[in-house]
């Protein structure tokens, strides 16, 4: 969150990156980074910009009719008002002309999650005389971070999700030889009930899939279309949940209901080794205090899978 106490670290990062400033923009919640950094109360329905310079105080450009959300803006920081597109563009040019600024923009839409500012707004900022670059590293350092409470909540959710996922596979295995084996949908329902009884919430899912269904990363069983889970099946359980207002934990568990075949073992070892390669790269870089990017970690895992002959089937990304 942008506050006076967080400003020095942010401005130090701007200086290290060779940037003149970070320009936040939002309209009707289009840009979650701007929304999260500012945490304005109430609803905003007009365009606004917030310019965080490498030195000096931040400046907000706000609409004249929408001042309520800005009542908590520090009095030592500037706040300008506009009431027409001409006054907006004039104020913007006064702030960023000749400057190299970061925005929530990803060249070529390389990282869609970061590409939040509309192309027309980028054009407006460039027409104001600024050079626009991506704010990706700033977003990672100052927005996409957890508080201590969020981390603790995530870890609690992660432990619960892990327990429920493994129990689900054991339950399916114990029922596979009975007169009433579970269906994918029945096991999905059981997991949802465990979430609810444990004080967890989810948006949809989980994915419970056997055989060919497990090859569909977004498969979800329904009451009308659901396979029966039998002995000898490979079962996938992909589940995610969080505490109320907490941080999601997302895990995938797979198990063989019975002795796995040689082919099953071969594929499992490839996936395990790919996971270990990714974790090894992370540990190596972090222990050496060297930067590491998600794409590098993905490459480390993907290289193992490809060399084992399964690259064309690795259709999902790594990272969650």
What are these regions (language model features)?
Residues 1-319:
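Active-site neighborhoods and metal-handling regions in enzymes and metal-associated proteins
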């Amino acid at each position: 969150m942008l506050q006076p106490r967080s400003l020095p670290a942010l401005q130090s990062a701007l200086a290290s990156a060779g940037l003149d400033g970070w320009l936040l923009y939002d309209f009707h919640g289009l840009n979650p980074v701007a929304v999260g950094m500012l945490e304005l109360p109430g609803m905003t329905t007009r365009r606004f910009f917030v310019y965080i310079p490498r030195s000096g105080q931040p400046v907000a450009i706000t609409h004249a009719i929408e001042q309520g959300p800005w009542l908590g803006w520090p009095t030592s920081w500037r706040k300008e008002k506009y009431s027409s597109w001409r006054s907006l563009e004039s104020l913007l040019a006064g702030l960023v002309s000749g400057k190299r600024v970061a925005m929530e923009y990803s060249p070529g839409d390389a990282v869609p999650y970061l590409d939040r500012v509309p192309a027309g707004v980028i054009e407006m900022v460039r027409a104001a005389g600024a050079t626009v670059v991506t704010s990706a590293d700033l977003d990672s350092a100052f927005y996409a971070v957890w508080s201590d409470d969020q981390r603790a909540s995530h870890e609690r959710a992660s432990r619960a999700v892990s327990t429920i996922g493994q129990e689900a596979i054991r339950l399916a295995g114990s029922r596979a030889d009975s007169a009433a084996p579970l269906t994918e949908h029945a096991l999905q329902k059981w997991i949802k009930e465990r979430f609810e009884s444990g004080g967890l919430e989810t948006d949809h899912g989980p994915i419970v899939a056997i055989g060919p269904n497990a090859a569909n990363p977004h498969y979800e069983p329904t009451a009308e279309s659901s396979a029966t889970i039998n002995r000898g099946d490979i079962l996938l359980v992909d589940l995610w949940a969080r505490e109320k207002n907490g941080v999601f934990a997302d895990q995938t568990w797979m198990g063989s209901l019975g002795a796995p075949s040689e082919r099953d073992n071969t594929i499992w070892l490839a996936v395990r080794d790919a996971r270990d390669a990714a974790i090894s790269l992370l540990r190596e870089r972090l222990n050496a205090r060297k930067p590491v990017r998600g794409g590098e970690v993905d490459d480390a895992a993907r290289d193992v899978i490809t060399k084992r002959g399964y690259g064309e089937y690795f259709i999902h990304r790594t990272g969650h």
